[in-house]
């Protein structure tokens, strides 16, 4: 999924994790990250694990200083949003070149993490936590 913006190729990808959804654009540039109009460092609270997660697909292909990442993300918390951005960036890189798919897939950047919060059941305090058992 690519389009042209001012004679530059733009590659789109969508990522999801828990309840977060990220729409990612990759544009040839110098490696800056913008998330919801803010810098990536600022948006992710300078958390190195979240920043590394966002940059992981580009690092896998050695393109960390070749593309700018522009993201619109909503829903969930920072961890879910960071992983959604990672998946969206990986999908956008697959649009860049079909050869990128294999290394990204072996690193696990293209797979959707199916884990999500388990619902609370009636009669219990939380999803699995029951009240204290009394024998007598």
From Swiss-Prot:
Segments of this protein annotated with the region Disordered: 95-136
Biological process (GO), any one: translation
Keywords: Ribonucleoprotein, Ribosomal protein
UniProt GO cellular component terms: cytosolic small ribosomal subunit
Membrane-spanning residues: none
A Pfam family that the UniProt record links to this protein: Ribosomal_S9
Residue ranges with Basic residues bias: 117-136
MF annotations from Gene Ontology: RNA binding; structural constituent of ribosome
Biased composition (Basic and acidic residues): 99-116
Protein family per UniProt: Belongs to the universal ribosomal protein uS9 family.
NCBIfam families named among the record's database cross-references: PRK00132.1
Protein name: Small ribosomal subunit protein uS9
Taxonomic placement: Bacteria, Bacillati, Cyanobacteriota, Cyanophyceae, Synechococcales
């Amino acid at each position: 999924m690519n389009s042209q913006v001012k004679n530059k190729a733009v590659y789109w990808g969508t990522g999801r994790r828990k309840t977060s959804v990220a729409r990612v654009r990759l544009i040839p540039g110098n490696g800056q990250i913008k998330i919801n109009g803010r810098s990536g460092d600022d948006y992710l609270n300078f958390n190195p694990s979240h920043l590394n997660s966002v940059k992981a697909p580009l690092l896998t292909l050695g393109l960390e200083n070749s593309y700018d990442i522009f993201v619109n993300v909503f829903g969930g918390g920072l961890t879910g949003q960071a992983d959604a951005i990672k998946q969206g960036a990986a999908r956008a890189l697959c649009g860049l070149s079909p050869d990128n798919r294999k290394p990204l897939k072996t690193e696990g950047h293209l797979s959707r993490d199916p884990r999500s919060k388990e619902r609370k059941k009636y009669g219990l305090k939380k999803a699995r936590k029951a009240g204290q058992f009394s024998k007598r």
